[in-house]
């Protein structure tokens, strides 16, 4: 796997996490191939870089690539992938599977599952993947979904093993257990990445509500490395990374003036 670090910037809306993610991705790309991913429904990458980004991976500069994910399209692709797989293994219940696919598209965690699946694919292609996350509640749901999906595949694995016994007794080939094990392995790879190669920067400013949301991220993501960042720092003392404010941080040159060395030092230590 090419990935060295998966980096999330999370926090309350309006604290500058998108600006920081852009600046950090730009600096990391000077070292190795880097992808900046926006999963915030209110995408801001294009506005900060002053370059149209869009929902397909686009090279912005040298080794810097970016994409603004469209959650609806991701869910549709993911549902079609599931539908295709289930139809292959269970052709006799094709109509029921199509109905099931509707539930996948509209399930409460459909977006989060599709996003995680795609991010893991990106980890195979880039040394650094930097994620400009959605506001706090949505970002936390992303990580909660991982644990839920992981438990679901453990259950499916047991069901598939029982089905395999019947198919073997009937003298028929059954590839379903292998498929589920492959999906479980993909989830295990993601678990390893989250545990060993992931950093979440909980971004806040000196306003109490943003500090509370950043602390919520710290409290709830106990199995992942979380570091507090105070953006637009003025005077507050804390055990955190402090980033002073600059005016109009738009465009490549302005982003390079942002004092993000403490974040880079933390990531590359």
Spans of features found by a protein language model:
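P-loop NTPase motor core
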Residues: 50-103
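Phosphate/Mg2+-binding loops and adjacent switch elements
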Residues: 90-201
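C-terminal lobe/tail of nucleotide-utilizing enzymes
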Residues: 2, 52, 184, 188-269
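Short, well-ordered alpha-helices that flank and scaffold nucleotide-derived cofactor binding pockets
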Residues: 26, 30, 121, 219
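Hydrophobic "anchor" residues on beta-strands that sit immediately upstream
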Residues: 7-8, 36, 128, 201, ...
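Walker A/P-loop NTP-binding active-site region of P-loop NTPases
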Residues: 7-69, 133, 142-149
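Switch/connector loops and helix/strand junctions flanking conserved nucleotide-binding motifs
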Residues: 44-48, 74-78, 137-141, 236-238, ...
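Short, high-confidence coil segments that cap the C-terminus of an alpha-helix
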Residues: 4, 32, 125-127, 223
